[in-house]
Amino acid sequence: MAGMSLLRRVSVTAVAALSGRSLGTRLGFGGFLTRGFPKAVAPVRHSGGHGKRLFVIKPSRFYDIRFLKLLRFYIALTGIPVVIIITLVNVFIGEAELAEIPEGYIPEHWEYYKHPISRWIARNFYDSPEKIYEKSMAVLQIEAEKAELRLKELEVRRLMRMRGDGPWYYYETIDKELIDHSPKATPDN
């Protein structure tokens, strides 16, 4: 680029010198090819000192900053109300105290927890221990019935092999005399 610019200026100076005009001195040249570079018309200024400032290409931080701002916003959006609710529950309701159980009263499963928030979670989201026990007993009963059926099937297969019986889904073929082989006008006749 610099070479092309220098070549253009030299050619302009050469044309001016050959045409008899003194265009070369007005362009900053002393004469035809007397100097390699033109003089600076105005002083070059680099603002801020420390030489020429460079444009450094670096990745954008827009999405990083936006993500961090949204993260702080949503943490504040959910965290502040949760902190307020927990503080109000601790101040105004407080923890449960251990007391004697009245005669004939059966406590619910959530009443064994000390903190009110733990009680609320146990009451609304967790199953009672009795329900969990019944579900596990139902699973055990189903698995026991499956094991019993597998043993019965093995015993049936053993007896069938021993006695030479066919499978229980075996059907006798129909008698050939019942099949009508006469020509038919339509397939459904």
UniProtKB/Swiss-Prot annotation:
GO terms for cellular component: mitochondrial inner membrane; nucleoplasm; respiratory chain complex I. It comes from the Eukaryota. It is found in: Mitochondrion inner membrane. The chain crosses the membrane at residues 73-93. Its main location: mitochondrion. Pfam families: NDUF_B5. Accessory subunit of the mitochondrial membrane respiratory chain NADH dehydrogenase (Complex I), that is believed not to be involved in catalysis. Complex I functions in the transfer of electrons from NADH to the respiratory chain. The immediate electron acceptor for the enzyme is believed to be ubiquinone. Belongs to the complex I NDUFB5 subunit family. This is NADH dehydrogenase [ubiquinone] 1 beta subcomplex subunit 5, mitochondrial. It comes from Macaca fascicularis. The gene is NDUFB5.
